[in-house]
């Protein structure tokens, strides 16, 4: 995904997006279109908006969304230009649906109606007992049957799974009626043509074909009865006994594979149409399909969806991550130039957008079932999910998909050597999958060739058909005798994990006995077959543990360097390493024909890599225009990502390092030719993804120029945590003196808590020393910090004894919240009484404005707020509630401000006081910081230096869900914004180390970094 949109005036001016309310929004859903940039698409996905389809158009990306009226209004208020999606007759999607229903359906039938889909499945089984078996594999939330049909000769007598088997399923998303029809017609194609068509007859006699045309029967029926555009199942998320927007689980995010891997591929929010559910496989519909998959372990699966047109395959959890079985997927799916389903775009699912907990990923990873998701067409321009109720159009869509569906059945006996009506075949060995799919070029998971080697022994690898058995490495050095070596299967590394290596596997061996200058020819043999060869040159063979990856792009154009015959800043790195007793090798990208270092040939030989970028703003070749990048930028990311996956350690540094990923610059994936960002659909442009930055480098948000002063210089930096604690440095002086830009980052663990997402653990290890910084403690070293999280009600609470003469509470607060939506306030009640109210700040920092969250229904999240606010019949809000009144602050406080609260109303009594911070459904500022609390009686006075003096994080009141995090006592190191972010294996600087002012300071920073990375 792209940049998280924070409301932080001092750090970033990014656009902010907000998703819709949970709970009782009963407005009809409708479809809209908007043209946005690539970064905005990522924001929409992250915020859980229901994105139906995307298309590359002039000026950006056209996005189709399904929105409630409330969601539409909120998104429009954030500056996204929405237009109702209409067909050629000017009808909206809901109007089209209403017209279909009013006229009576010709094609479509519901689940429950007499003669509906359920009855039809029973009738098919009843009429064809010799080759059709019906099985109820589970029941839905509301008790409807989930019906599967097994089609094979002697179906009722033959044990399940006795023949090569294939699974066709549909309607996991309720509104996708065309998927139901295509699956139903495919079922009829086999049933109705058995003993009539020789191809069908042979398949039914020799294969086992399973069908579940409706895997979400509750949702499917609901689309007929209530809401045509409903997507999820009918789980009652808030337990109010009603079905409304905010209910339901996205069943295609509920499977027990990478479930809750992150908050991008699925959502934790009820209201999101990608809500993943309370736990993996929590839904009975999911359990039914999972149990079937585990029991039968199909050879193949096809799960029909709409709308695209797309033909997606594994994986969904991480971008540009093909499986080891990719030769099968490519052979059967085809390519952009020649797809297996005419007009469809085949490819890896995550390259559309990240998903996790999906049916296909579960099937492949857990049950060794290779799976596809055809995203069927919409039927007409502007029809969206309401495919026309037109027999000819529906049948045409089925016929278009039939050849691929038949290929899947035909290929079941030997998946490793599939049948394709395109004539595609697979080979025993692959060194380079880009030969069959240009989109796989230079990906370390699919392109294993390299030109130079930096070590001996030199690992080499090949993708080999598993049935070949033992694979032998063959190589020649300088044309000498052929030498042989064993190979072993690669385990996938630390992060990639399961390679999906059911029928193919990556085999590795080692070439030994080379010297610098040698030319080595490599190939592999096994099972009577041999791979193509490739040749590399041995260049470097040292015992150095560190590689300096010089990626200055001095032969590029952004900027144009004065010195273009070699690196400008390399000496600063080599010298700083030498000062710490470390010798290093160098890989100069420009000098290597602008080629990224190979994982195997170069990076694998080192324990740590220093990747620096000098003055490079964006890696861009001559002839490329603004808004675009060289494919080299993506190649470098993929190479370093693969290196980290195998246990490597990295320091990334540069004044613009990561800007291209953060801003989503486009590049040509296939040919590295210039591409036009305003016409991406015609020239192969793809965006640089920031997933590497977020999930490998621990930097969830890139804050552009956040460490730069008004006069263009950089603030000093102070170390706050491992490995830079107690270290400080400045810029300029006797250095490269080139630091005129900077970045800070929000640590990924500040957004995805390490307690839940330990794989992304990260922290701010150094910060810019901004004078009067609004997010450092007001005094001393400690303060209370709210942390960052949506849908939370956080309280810092203490009981105070108020004397007869009254008392006063004062404290300093610095807050940055989503303006008008998230609020900071002081609430109080007499101990033992329900007289709750909020108290105004006598210094004028609070107001009675209820903001935008109250009329948008945030009481559904936090019903306790009814004590202070009232939602009126006209959808306005009053700042009084059942027991008290509303006084709060929102937005950015502009730094530390002092609040003063009068407690005289509680004279002679005990009062429980809470400093509270409440957030809505989505979008976070940087949170709330509290320091230097003073109570006039002395009771509860604290600056948090030695403790909290009785102030505790008490959690939310009744009615709100549990907080994902709470107020904590911490140093500035507990706030996740930093000039440097550190993970277990990486350090990421928002500046170039070459610009640190003095050699001694550079040496100290380098020493700390290397001490950590080489530990």
Regions found by a protein language model. Name each.
Residues 616-746:
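A glycine-rich, often tryptophan-bearing local segment used as a flexible ligand/cofactor-contacting loop or short
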Residues 821-823, 894, 919-937, 999-1003:
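Extracellular carbohydrate recognition
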Residues 490, 726-794, 819, 837-897, ...:
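Extracellular glycan-recognition surfaces and repeat-rich motifs
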Residues 288, 395-413, 528-530, 540-545, ...:
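Extracellular ligand-binding/catalytic regions of CAZymes and related secreted enzymes
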Residues 807-815, 824, 910-919, 944:
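Extracellular beta-strand-rich recognition modules
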Residues 412-549, 556-584, 795-802, 808-810, ...:
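Glycan-association/targeting regions that enable binding to alpha-glucans and other polysaccharides
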Residues 224-226, 230-432, 706:
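Metallocarboxypeptidase
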Residues 156, 491, 561-672, 908:
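Helical hinge/lid and interdomain linker segments adjacent to catalytic or ligand-binding clefts
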């Amino acid at each position: 995904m792209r940049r998280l949109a924070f409301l932080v005036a001092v750090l970033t001016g990014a656009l902010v997006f907000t998703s819709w309310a949970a709970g009782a929004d009963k407005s009809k859903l409708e479809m809209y279109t908007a043209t946005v940039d690539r970064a905005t698409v990522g924001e929409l996905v992250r915020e859980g908006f229901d994105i139906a389809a995307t298309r590359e158009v002039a000026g950006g990306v056209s996005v189709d969304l399904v929105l409630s009226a409330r969601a539409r209004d909120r998104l429009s208020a954030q500056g996204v230009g929405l237009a109702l999606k209409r067909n050629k007759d000017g009808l909206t999607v809901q109007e089209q649906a209403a017209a279909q229903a009013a006229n009576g359906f010709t094609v479509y039938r519901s689940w429950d109606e007499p003669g509906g889909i359920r009855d039809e499945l029973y009738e098919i089984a009843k009429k064809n007992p010799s080759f059709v078996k019906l099985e109820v594999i589970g029941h839905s939330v509301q008790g409807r049957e989930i019906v599967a049909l097994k089609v094979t000769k002697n179906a009722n007598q033959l044990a399940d799974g006795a023949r090569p088997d294939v699974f066709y399923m549909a309607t996991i998303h309720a509104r996708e009626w065309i998927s139901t029809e295509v699956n139903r017609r495919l079922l009829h194609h086999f049933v109705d043509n058995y003993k009539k068509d020789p191809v069908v007859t042979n398949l039914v006699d020799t294969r086992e074909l399973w069908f579940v045309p409706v895997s979400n029967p509750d949702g499917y029926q609901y689309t007929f009865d209530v809401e045509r555009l409903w997507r999820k199942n009918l789980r009652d998320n808030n337990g109010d006994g009603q079905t409304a927007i905010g209910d339901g689980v996205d069943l295609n995010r509920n499977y027990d594979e990478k479930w809750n891997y992150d908050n991008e591929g699925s959502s934790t929010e009820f209201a999101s149409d990608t809500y993943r559910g309370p736990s993996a496989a929590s839904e009975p519909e999911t359990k039914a399909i999972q149990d079937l998959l585990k029991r039968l372990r199909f050879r193949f699966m096809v799960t029909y969806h709409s709308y695209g047109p797309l033909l997606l395959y594994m994986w969904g959890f991480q971008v540009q991550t093909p499986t080891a079985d990719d030769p099968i997927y490519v052979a059967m799916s085809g390519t952009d130039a020649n797809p297996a389903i005419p007009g469809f775009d085949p490819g890896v699912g995550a390259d559309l957008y990240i998903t996790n907990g999906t049916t296909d990923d579960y099937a492949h990873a857990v049950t060794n079932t290779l799976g596809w998701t055809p995203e069927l067409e919409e039927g007409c321009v502007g029809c969206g999910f309401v495919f026309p109720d037109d027999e000819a159009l529906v049948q045409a869509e089925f016929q278009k998909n039939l050849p691929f569906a038949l290929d899947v059945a035909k290929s079941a006996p030997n998946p490793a050597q599939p049948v394709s009506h395109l004539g595609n075949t697979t080979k025993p060995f692959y060194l380079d999958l880009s030969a069959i799919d240009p989109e796989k070029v230079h990906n370390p998971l699919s392109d294993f060739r390299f030109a130079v080697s930096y070590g001996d022994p030199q690992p080499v690898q090949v993708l080999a058909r598993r049935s070949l058995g033992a694979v032998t490495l063959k190589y020649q050095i300088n044309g000498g005798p052929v030498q042989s070596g064993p190979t072993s299967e690669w385990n996938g590394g630390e992060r990639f994990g399961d390679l999906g290596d059911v029928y193919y596997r990556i085999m590795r061996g080692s070439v030994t006995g080379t010297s610098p200058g040698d030319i080595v020819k490599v190939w592999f043999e096994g099972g009577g077959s041999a791979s193509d060869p490739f040749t590399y040159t041995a260049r470097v063979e040292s015992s150095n543990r560190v590689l300096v990856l010089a990626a200055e792009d001095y032969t590029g154009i952004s900027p144009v360097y004065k010195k273009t015959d070699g690196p400008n800043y390399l000496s600063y790195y080599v010298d700083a390493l030498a000062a710490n007793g470390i010798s290093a090798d160098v890989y100069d990208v420009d000098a290597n024909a602008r080629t990224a270092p190979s994982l195997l040939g170069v990076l694998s030989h080192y324990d740590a890599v220093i990747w620096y970028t000098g003055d490079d703003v964006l890696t861009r070749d001559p002839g490329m225009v603004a808004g675009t990048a060289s494919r080299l930028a993506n190649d470098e990311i993929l190479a370093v990502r693969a290196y980290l996956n195998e246990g490597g350690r990295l320091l990334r540094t540069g004044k613009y390092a990561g800007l291209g990923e953060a801003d989503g610059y486009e590049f040509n994936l296939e040919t590295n030719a210039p591409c036009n960002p305003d016409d991406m659909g015609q020239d192969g442009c793809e965006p640089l993804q920031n997933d590497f930055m977020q999930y490998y480098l621990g930097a969830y948000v890139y804050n552009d120029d956040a460490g730069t002063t008004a006069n263009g210089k950089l603030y000093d930096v102070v170390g706050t945590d491992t490995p830079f604690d107690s270290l400080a440095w400045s810029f300029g002086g006797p250095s490269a003196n080139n630091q005129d830009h900077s970045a800070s980052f929000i640590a990924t663990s500040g957004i995805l808590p390490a307690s839940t997402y330990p794989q992304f653990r990260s922290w701010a290890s150094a910060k810019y020393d901004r004078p009067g910084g609004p997010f450092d403690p007001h005094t001393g070293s400690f303060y209370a910090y709210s942390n960052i999280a949506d849908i939370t009600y956080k309280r810092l609470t203490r009981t105070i004894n108020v004397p007869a003469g009254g008392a006063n509470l004062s404290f300093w607060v610095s807050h940055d919240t989503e303006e008008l939506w998230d609020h900071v306030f002081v609430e109080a009640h007499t101990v033992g009484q329900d007289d709750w109210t909020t108290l105004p700040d006598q210094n004028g920092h609070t107001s009675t404005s209820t903001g935008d969250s109250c009329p948008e229904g945030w009481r559904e999240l936090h019903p306790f707020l009814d004590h202070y606010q009232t939602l009126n019949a006209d959808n306005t809000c009053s700042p009084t509630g059942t027991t008290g009144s509303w006084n709060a602050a929102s937005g950015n406080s502009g730094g530390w401000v002092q609040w003063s609260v009068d407690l005289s109303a509680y004279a002679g009594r005990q009062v429980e006081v809470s400093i509270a911070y409440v957030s809505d459904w989505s979008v976070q500022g940087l949170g709330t910081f509290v320091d230097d609390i003073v109570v006039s009686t002395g009771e509860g006075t604290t600056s948090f230096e030695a403790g909290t003096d009785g102030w505790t994080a008490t959690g939310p009141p009744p009615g709100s869900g549990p907080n994902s995090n709470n107020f904590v006592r911490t140093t500035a190191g507990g706030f996740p914004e930093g000039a440097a972010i550190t993970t277990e294996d990486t350090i990421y600087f928002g500046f170039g180390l070459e610009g640190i002012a003095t050699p001694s300071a550079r040496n100290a920073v380098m020493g700390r970094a290397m001490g950590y990375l080489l530990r």
